[in-house]
């Protein structure tokens, strides 16, 4: 990686971590467009990628920022130094809206962290029981893509997002 690429990657992570919550999607998109890597591994921060960084910043992560990173190719199932995924971190913060987005983009709730826990086990450990319902409904949705299941997922998420 050349110096310019390194600087762009660091600026993207810094912007995601330190800008205010309503961080400008235009700036993020511009950084990515000119070469910042949405899958850049920050070796100084647990080998996190930008999507993990934005979820670290706050339990109220901007859904549009998360969607933009995913639309630009962020790996939804990337595991950091501790094998933690974006979904696992989101569950710890109890952010149902972000969890739904991650699951919509294909987050795998069965990956294991360094303690051999998957997202379901983490939801139980952190007592985020509604998250278990969401994950179970996504499993059903993947097997039987019905409108009834999608509506139930939206209903549960909306209870906690509104």
Swiss-Prot record:
InterPro entries: Ankyrin_rpt, Ankyrin_rpt-contain_sf. Keywords: ANK repeat, Repeat. It comes from the Viruses. Signal peptide: none annotated. SMART domains: ANK (SM00248). PROSITE patterns: ANK_REP_REGION, ANK_REPEAT. ANK repeats lie at residues 10-40, 47-78, 82-111. This is Putative ankyrin repeat protein R664.
